[in-house]
Design a protein with these regions (language model features):
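Conserved pre-ATP/AMP-binding loop-to-beta segment of ANL
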Residues: 26, 32-33, 70-84, 116-127
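AMP-binding/adenylate-forming catalytic domain of the ANL superfamily
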Residues: 375-399
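AMP-binding/adenylate-forming
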Residues: 97-115, 126-181, 221
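AMP-binding/adenylate-forming catalytic core of the ANL superfamily
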Residues: 281-282, 287-381
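ATP-dependent adenylate-forming carboxylate-activation enzymes
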Residues: 31-35, 52-63, 130, 150-168, ...
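Conserved ATP/PPi-binding loop(s) of AMP-dependent carboxylate-activating enzymes
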Residues: 242, 251-282, 303, 313-315
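Gly/Ser/Thr-rich phosphate-binding loop
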Residues: 183-238, 247-249
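Conserved adenylation A10 loop of the ANL superfamily
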Residues: 79-96
Length: 417
């Protein structure tokens, strides 16, 4: 049975909607009104189309790259959704998946939510979705609301307001969004709310954040997943365990997953998703390092690719470095995650400028590199902190050596000639 798609609740208009169809059948949808974007994507899917939600903040060059990738795609039979993801070279990639790969997760997720909230069902509840819809978390949650008979509410601005929160029963977002909600409740004093569950992905939930939410009567379901794999494991406060229907295996410290939620195709380059077939089925890995206890509790130990988690987005350092190194003003570049109390990490860039930058001041160089990145990278990928050094250390193979933030701070400063 095809679920109906009620229009998401909007608190105000935020701009016009842009739809661009491609020869492959994929339609790019962008707009500043995220409720309208999600509503149109759901309608397009119900009509048999393949929605690809974009970012209204993209530069014209970035938008053209995405459209070129989408037009060149050859979607397999049954593909119903497309989502943008960042490649390791800085070029955009598009994930294609079947509707069933998301829908198979919703009954298990509904049971977890209902149990955490003390409800008999999630139907009829209102889901607050503050995530930018360019993230696959956005359309995943919007389809979830439609599939399970929930009302969808999308904030009208970048920040969550008391008006957005009023009447919301559950939140689907990142730790950053949960922090916003708790700060809002603190600021509003006696403000009454009915939020009972926060479904949180994109980064780990800090124990202190979970405890603060629970004191407010908000149960937290933190989950670990990946754009390629969807939901992998969930933590209701007792530890991160396999999501219903998902099997986990650890080999040489790396997590492998057996799941029916996996994306079907990747357009725009080689996939970083590893695939192995065995007697008990197909196992997939995105290279996350983990520990798995005897009683099934999963502990995340980082990514093999040193991925940066910032405000719920996953950024591969190599993707940003590739764009920086293409600038004539850059000789070497090192991108890393700088700790941030609210966002988890900030994308930071340590640059060894080339001789072409010798006559620029540090301020002008930073401004030029920011403009360079704005035309070529998604907003989440763009460096927010900049450091310029006279010498970036190299590995024996000649690549910049991966450094800890404390080591970066000790590098010799760059001074223009």
């Amino acid at each position: 049975m095809t679920p109906t798609h009620p229009a998401p609740q909007r608190e105000g208009e935020r701009g016009s909607l842009h739809l661009e169809s491609t020869a492959s059948g994929i339609t790019l949808i962008t707009g500043a009104d995220h409720a309208e974007v999600l509503e149109r994507a759901l309608r397009l899917r119900a009509d048999g189309g393949i929605p690809l939600i974009g970012d209204e903040r993209w530069s014209p060059q970035r938008r053209a790259q995405i459209l070129e990738r989408a037009a060149a795609a050859s979607p397999e039979e049954g593909i119903g959704w497309a989502a943008c993801t960042s490649g390791s070279t800085g070029t955009p990639k598009i994930l294609l998946r079947t509707p069933a790969s998301w829908e198979i997760a919703y009954p298990g997720l509904d049971r977890l939510i209902a149990r955490a909230a003390g409800w008999s069902t999630t139907a009829g509840r209102t889901l607050l979705l503050p995530v930018h819809p360019v993230s696959s978390m956005g359309p995943f949650a919007a389809v979830h609301a439609a599939h399970s008979g929930m009302r969808l509410r999308v904030p009208r601005g970048v920040r969550i307001t008391a008006e957005d929160l009023a009447g919301a029963d559950l939140l689907h977002g990142t730790p950053w969004h949960l922090r916003e909600v708790l700060d809002l409740l603190d600021a509003q004093g006696a403000f009454s709310h009915r939020l009972r569950v926060a479904v949180i992905g994109g980064d780990r939930v800090d124990p202190a954040l979970r405890a603060e939410a629970e004191r407010r009567g908000i149960a937290v379901l933190g989950y670990y997943g990946a754009a390629e794999l969807s939901l992998v494991a969930v933590d209701d406060g007792s530890g991160l365990r396999a999501f219903p229907g998902v099997r986990l295996r650890v080999r040489r410290g790396v997590l492998w997953v057996r799941t029916e939620q996996a994306a079907r195709q990747l357009i725009g380059g080689a996939s970083t998703l590893r695939r192995e077939e065995s007697e008990d089925g197909v196992w997939l890995s995105v290279g996350d390092r983990v520990r798995l206890s005897e009683d099934g509790v999963l502990t995340l130990c980082g990514r093999e690719d040193q991925a940066i988690l910032t405000a719920g987005a996953t950024v591969t350092p190599e993707a940003v470095e590739a764009v920086l190194l293409a600038s004539p003003l850059v000789d070497r570049a090192l991108v890393y995650g700088a700790p941030h109390p609210r966002l988890g990490q900030l994308v930071a860039a340590c640059i060894q400028p080339s001789s072409a930058a010798s006559e620029l001041s540090e301020r002008r160089l930073r401004r030029k590199l920011r403009a360079w990145c704005a035309r070529r990278l998604d907003p989440a990928q763009r460096p927010r902190r900049w450091l310029f050094t006279a010498a970036l250390p190299r590995t024996p193979s000649g690549k910049p050596r991966r450094l800890r933030p404390a080591e970066v701070a000790d590098l010799p400063p760059w001074t223009p000639s």
